[in-house]
Amino acid sequence: RVCTDQACALKGADSILEHLCQHHQIQPGQTKTDGSLTIEYAPCLGLCDHAPAALVNDEAETDISTDLHHYDLGIPTSRVFGNLRELTANCGNGRPTLLAEYGEYSAFQKALSMSPEAIIAEITASGLVGRGGAAFPTGIKWEGARQAPGTQKYVVCNTDESEPGTFKDRALLLDDPHRVIEGMLIAGYAIGASHGYFYLRGEYPYILPVIEAALDEARQAGFIGTNIHNSGFSFEVDVRLGAGAYICGEETALFESIEGKRGFPRIKPPFPTTNGLFNQPTVINNVETICNVPLIIEKGANYYRKIGTDKSTGSKLFCLSGDVTKPGVYEIPFGVTLRELMEMAGGVRAGRRLKAVIPGGSSMPVLPGDIMMQTDMDYDSIAKAGSMLGSGAVIVMDETTCMVRVLERLSRFYHMESCGQCTPCREGTGWMHRMLQRIVDGKGRAGDLELLRSAAGQISWTPASRR
């Protein structure tokens, strides 16, 4: 499965796919007559820092070149940079951090000495907001779930980072799984939950053994199970592997998937804090959000608020990919400019000029490079510039990039990944992609641009996309 989404395309993925097909004498989507090989297009695999990339069965093939005659398959190494190491202190070492190295869950043990109300108050005071894209205040979410009636409550770790250009959660899960587990335990204790779930994206099968091994370590150490360390608090954790649907990154579609149903978003309200997984009160946070929790409980809200800006507190993990010299995960405080971030990353590769940037994942508006270079990397500044911070996936495009081809490629992704629940999106994304293909092929028609605007407007107001 060869990724041909934007980050990999900028590194020559189309040529790699063509080379493979010519070598094996089959076309994309076809299988060799002996059944030994199938070659497929693939949407973003979360390997953008190792572009161009592919999955061979369940193993990652990274930094592919047509010059290579032998490929090393396995687990990708995290490339972690930046001027902070609060969340990424244990990342970038090329292997998972063991419990003996991570420590005895000191933040969780401190949390057990606090009241649930005090924990939620500390999270609220820190200013932590969701890092998956919505930026909803975490403390408010937790308080809503705690106050909701119900004897069975859940904590769900959304590890389905399917937004093209995003790969930070992959690094956290591969390199520091115990930080994620500890954050889930604290969340469970705070809201009164007794069960947690990891929902792992289908393109990350190689992470599953890492999570399972870390959970086994935590169980053997008495941090998961019944009456944990004689505290009266019990908590179990299970893992569910998704099937690769982009829509299951949406929280309620994710619940449907865990429950064994088709991944359709639910109508809101009611919200997950009252009617979530199995219709019970649920806190769902993404990996990066949960990894902030042990830090806040261990060092306090005041320490946390000193990082970042007044309105965007803490650090942020940015995923730099595309036409950048050093792609990878960068942990920086909110408020650092893109210019500073690009300097850390060695600038635009090959000494070219910056043309455009997608600042927060492929569903965010594209901004011109000159505007982005003067923009602070925080929620308010990106919004004022005309886009959104989203998941923090920064896709860099140089002066050689054709923006019409970029749009055509993005439209293909959203056409392929539409959940199909609403007709304007199910059909409209196909119309848009076909029109853009015509334009890219030099066969554009008068009125195409107006039709594109009209279709985009109708899709944006479909019921599911407004939830």
Regions of interest found by a model, annotated:
Residues R1-R467:
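Feature of Fe-S/electron-transfer and energy-metabolism proteins
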